[in-house]
């Protein structure tokens, strides 16, 4: 392995470590309540090292949000991969539920940003996210024209999927309390995922 390749791999590993720590701390404290020193401590690195990779807190915050959205948009690639709506919607819901299970802090960072008026994401929502959503909407409308699904407002369908799947991350503490103070077991979470899939498919006659 060349020295250059090794440097690139080290950089990627360090950036991933910092982003994971930042996702957690931003989710807990919010943007204003977070200092880069808090993130550095969570990552187990000196603050100077953090700023070597991310010059400012704002840069880091934007990168965290970008990574979250990139993964969410990648989950919807099922709309292109699968020709049948049942397969596409099933895979999409499962991917979203898995993200909420594995990356609850990511979902909460996003929720905090939106609930605060999207000061950082505002322009991004009106461009990148809107373009992506419009592609999903066109696919859903095509399914309707082809009579593969019952008529449905594509925006309402997407919002319903987002609200339900992200609930398992954003309101995890509420679920724990209502579940007798225990996290949902892997088995129970799989059952919940299948139930959400069933409800989504049923909403469009599948």
Where on the chain are the PLM-derived regions?
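Hydrophobic/aromatic residues within well-ordered alpha-helical segments
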Residues: 14, 57, 64, 68, ...
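Amphipathic alpha-helical linker/stalk segments
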Residues: 62-91, 136-142
């Amino acid at each position: 392995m060349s020295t250059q390749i090794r440097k690139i791999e080290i950089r990627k590993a360090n950036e991933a470590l910092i982003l994971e720590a930042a996702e957690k701390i931003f989710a807990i404290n919010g943007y204003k309540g977070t200092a880069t020193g808090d993130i550095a401590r969570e990552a187990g690195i000196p603050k100077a090292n953090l700023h070597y990779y991310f010059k400012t807190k704002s840069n880091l915050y934007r990168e965290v949000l970008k990574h979250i959205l990139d993964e969410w948009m990648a989950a919807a690639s099922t709309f292109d991969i699968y020709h049948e709506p049942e397969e596409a919607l099933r895979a999409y819901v499962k991917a979203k539920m898995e993200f909420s299970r594995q990356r609850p802090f990511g979902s909460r960072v996003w929720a905090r940003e939106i609930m605060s008026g999207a000061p950082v994401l505002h322009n991004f929502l009106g461009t990148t996210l809107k373009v992506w959503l419009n592609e999903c909407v066109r696919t859903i409308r095509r399914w309707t024209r082809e009579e593969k699904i019952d008529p449905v407002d594509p925006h309402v369908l997407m919002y319903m999927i987002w609200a339900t799947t992200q609930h398992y991350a954003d309101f995890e503490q509420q679920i724990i309390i209502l579940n007798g103070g225990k996290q949902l077991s892997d088995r129970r979470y799989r059952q919940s995922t299948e139930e959400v899939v069933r409800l989504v498919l049923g909403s469009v006659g599948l």
